[in-house]
UniProtKB/Swiss-Prot annotation:
Role this protein plays: Catalyzes the depolymerization of both polygalacturonate and pectins of methyl esterification degree from 22 to 89%, with an endo mode of action. In contrast to the majority of pectate lyases, displays high activity on highly methylated pectins.
Native source organism of the sequence: Bacillus licheniformis (strain ATCC 14580 / DSM 13 / JCM 2505 / CCUG 7422 / NBRC 12200 / NCIMB 9375 / NCTC 10341 / NRRL NRS-1264 / Gibson 46)
A molecular function (GO) term: pectate lyase activity
Upper classification of the organism: Bacteria, Bacillati, Bacillota, Bacilli, Bacillales
Gene field: pelC
Protein name (database record): Pectate lyase C
Keyword Metal-binding on entry: yes
Documented EC number(s): 4.2.2.2, 4.2.2.10
Localisation per UniProt entry: Secreted
């Protein structure tokens, strides 16, 4: 582990003082040919490992038939991983899940998709270069993102188009830049978003379809 001017370099993850992580480009990639399952209640600690998807999983485009690099089951934790390009369909969560210091260098179809009901918390990490959305919510859930950096995407968070289930979205201490459409887009009148202590710039309309938004101590720059 190395320290540099307020940062910590840990096996390929450059983690700044706010817990946000950026990748070290020099780290060699390991090719994943079959989805890695983080089983119920278990923790997968990549220790800074950099992974890319093999052709069996997908090419990282917007094709809907791609498979994830990680499947995170109920009560499981994924941490300290860098996902390079191609990232196929990123990470799928099933139930309650913790995602800590995961970096998406070049978002594939999506960075992360909520596939079943639960509470998902993303703490630390970063994502960039998403052709469409970064995070996709497909089931009723509480979805929390904190200490995260996102740059260049269509939407930071998108609830499944046309769905009416309730998603409770919390965004705290994030930096969000260069979104073409919005920070959060939903078609559900029952979903809500709370954003606090967050810096943002060039994010389109900020909210699309959101009926319940709470904002505190944010800064547009």
């Amino acid at each position: 582990m190395k320290r540099l001017a307020g940062t910590v370099i840990l096996s390929g993850l450059l983690v700044c003082g706010f817990g946000q992580a950026l990748p070290e480009k020099a780290l060699a990639a390991e090719v994943v040919h079959k989805t890695i399952v983080v089983e119920k209640g278990q923790t997968y600690d990549g220790k800074g490992k950099r992974l890319i998807a093999g052709p069996e999983l997908g090419d990282g485009s917007q094709r809907e038939d791609q498979k994830p690099i990680f499947k995170v089951e109920d009560g499981a934790t994924l941490k300290n991983v860098v996902l390079g390009a191609p990232a196929a369909d990123g990470v799928h969560t099933y139930g309650n899940a913790s995602i800590n210091n995961v970096v998406w260098e070049d978002v594939g179809e999506d960075a992360l998709t909520v596939k079943s009901e639960g509470s998902v918390t993303i703490n630390g990490g970063s994502a960039r270069l998403a052709a469409d959305k970064i995070f996709q919510i497909n089931k009723a859930s509480t979805f929390t993102v904190k200490n995260f950096t996102a740059d260049q995407g269509g939407k930071f968070i998108r609830q499944l188009g046309g769905s009416t289930f309730k998603a409770v979205v919390n965004i705290d201490n994030c930096t969000i830049t260069n979104m073409k459409e919005a920070i959060f887009r939903t078609d559900s009148s029952t979903s809500s978003v709370t954003m606090t202590n967050t810096r943002y710039s060039k994010v389109g309309q900020k909210w699309i379809g959101v009926k319940h938004a709470t904002e505190r101590n944010n800064h547009e720059f």
